[in-house]
Every structure is written in C-alpha cells, then in structure tokens.
C-alpha cells in the first residue's frame, strides 16, 4: 500500500493520512523531491518491467520505464501516467540510466531533474511527454560528483579522489557543453580526514537562493 501523510502539526500520535492507494508491483519512487501545484503532487517514478525479477529467474530488476505518480490530495486519488517521448515511445530506464534520488525543479509545466547517477530528464507534468537530456558521470575510481539544479541548468560539484581538488561545473538543460566555474584545493585537508575520522565525502551542497551564476 502507498500512503501520503502530513508531517506538520497534527492531533494525537498519528499524522493525518492525505491519500492511500494500492501498492503496484514493481513501482518505486526512490525520491525525496517532487513537483507540487496546489493540491496535486507529481513524482517521476520507476515501473519495473519484471517485478518478480530475481537471481533465480535471470530477469533484470533494473529494467523498466518512467511513469508519473500524480496524487490529488483534495480527493486522495492517485493516477499513474506513462512518460513517453515525442514519438510516443516509453522512456526506458536501466542500470546505466536511472532516475533514482534526483534533484529537480519545475519550470512552467516541465519538471527538470538529474538523478544521483547523473542522468538528466525533462517531463511535462500535464501531458506526460518526456525527454532524456544528457548524462554527467557521477562516480568513477578517481572522482565522485553531486548535483544541484536551477531553472536554467545543472550544477555538478566534482571531488577528485586522489588529491581532493573540488571543481564546480555548470551545464544548461538545453544541451550546451558543460563548463567549469571554479576549482579549489581549500577543502582538501578536511576531506582527507584524520586517523580518527577517515576520509570525508561530499554528500550534497547548496546554491545561494537567487544565484544562478552558471547561466551568466
């Protein structure tokens, strides 16, 4: 069963339940962000092609398509909308191209987001028409990258594992090439850690509200 609850002030020990819907095999969100307009919450989600995949049957649990879960909190109803491209084909997902733990922003009717894996998409939350935009490698043997987004593009903070030099890149949603904004080694001493702490990892970062310097 899928449930939407309200975590603000409530009466008693149990938060109010806003919506309930039956669990659908193979449907997962894996998100901590969503589009919200009025009483309607919309969340890009993953629908597995093989919900019963296991090592025993040889089916791949990572193969599936993108859908939108749309929750109308005024009625408590959920609608599942397949996400399709301009030709009407499904937006396919797999181990190499994911939407898991995305950072997203709504611009008009379009929800733009990039997954923790570095795959960027845009989806019209009204029609369900979507498009794959680009990918930015998020992790390799010698670096790791975390993302933030603005209305104009993606900010990627890369931590180089060997010397812990940190670089901020920017790439517009419209597909222009990625460009470097700045590089610093000032965090190196902290990230390398100590005998007590071990090495540190950058889990996330924030953009100053209203700042969109990469677009300038």
Predicted feature locations:
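Eukaryotic intrinsically disordered, low-complexity regulatory linkers and tails enriched in Ser/Thr/Pro
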Residues: 9-16, 22, 42-45
